[in-house]
Regions:
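Short, well-ordered alpha-helical scaffold segments within catalytic/effector domains
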Residues: 1, 21, 132-136
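Metal-centered catalytic cores of metalloenzymes
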Residues: 1-2, 34, 95, 174
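Active-site HxH/HxHxD metal-binding segment of metal-dependent hydrolases
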Residues: 2-61
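Phenylalanine-focused residue identity feature
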Residues: 23-27, 37, 52, 68-69, ...
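Metallo-beta-lactamase
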Residues: 37-173
Length: 174
């Protein structure tokens, strides 16, 4: 928390999807002046979070960090983020990219999921997609952004040819 405080005050704490929420309350407790927002539907999974607002479409941080709700994948209800100043697209579980240098269980699982050595949607997320057209509509705006870097929550950061890799990752849905 000291490293974050050195950057500046924490004004918002976000649970970006229905899977990434375990440290939401500890962060809120450590940042008493911050506002907390949760993914749509997370309050059903975590009744202790019912007092928090859902991530708004018009967010107070929108001038710095633009959010895009991803429809069609209700198991996640993920919002992804674009930081225009750096051209960075930030994703949690919508896409994965595990390094081919990983070994053991990580290499095995990422290979089975189809995300070993490439940016892509895991086979489990493809299977969990409930509305492919809605998902396609949701990701279409992402492919028009001036993305210079893709940060995924699991393993690799994509600095080389991020737009081409995004297009390839979402080709199955178009």
């Amino acid at each position: 928390m000291d490293e974050l405080a050195a950057i500046g005050p924490i004004r918002y704490v976000i649970a970006p999807n229905k899977s990434h929420h375990l440290f939401f309350l500890p962060f809120m407790n450590a940042s008493p002046s911050a506002e907390g927002f949760i993914a749509a539907g997370l309050e059903l999974k975590r009744p202790d979070l019912q007092g928090f607002a859902q991530i708004p479409s018009e967010a107070p941080w929108g001038s710095e960090l633009q959010g895009f709700f991803v429809d069609g994948l209700p198991i996640l209800n993920e919002t992804v983020w674009f930081h225009a100043a750096t051209g960075t697209l930030i994703l949690t579980d919508l896409l994965f990219c595990f390094s081919r240098t990983n070994r053991g269980l990580t290499a095995l699982v990422s290979t089975i999921l189809g995300v070993n050595g490439k940016l892509g949607m895991s086979r489990t997320m493809k299977f969990a997609t409930k509305d492919r057209r809605a998902l396609a509509r949701s990701v279409a705006p992402l492919l028009t952004l001036p993305v210079q870097r893709v940060i995924v929550a699991h393993d690799q950061i994509i600095d080389e040819e991020p737009m081409a890799k995004l297009a390839e990752a979402f080709a199955w849905v178009r």
